[in-house]
UniProtKB/Swiss-Prot annotation:
Localisation per UniProt entry: Cytoplasm
Family: Belongs to the sulfur carrier protein TusA family.
Keywords for the protein's UniProt record, in alphabetical order: Cytoplasm
Main location: cytoplasm
Protein name per its UniProtKB record: Sulfur carrier protein TusA
Organism for this UniProt entry: Shewanella frigidimarina (strain NCIMB 400)
PROSITE patterns: UPF0033
């Protein structure tokens, strides 16, 4: 795993969860975070490759990095306003 992912302040294991569960879990986790904090999401649902970027855009969070070249997928999000 790239070093950028190890710097995340929070981590969410969404392995085995299927749409819409990963995004629901992300939303619940992000609500508890402070603005600017980061969240590493580890998932294996192929739908997350479109759902997580869309969620970030819709909710004004930043998708800092993603690795979807192989499973499990890794996403690094930064909480927005």
């Amino acid at each position: 795993m790239n070093d950028i992912y190890t710097q995340a302040q929070h981590q969410l294991d969404a392995l085995g969860l299927r749409c819409p569960e990963p995004v629901m879990m992300i939303r619940k986790t992000v609500r508890k975070m402070a603005e600017g904090e980061t969240l590493l999401v580890i998932a294996d649902d192929p739908a997350t490759t479109r759902d997580i970027p869309s969620f970030c855009e819709f909710m004004d969070h930043t998708l800092i990095a993603s690795d979807i070249s192989k499973t499990p997928y890794h996403y690094l999000l930064k909480k927005g306003l």
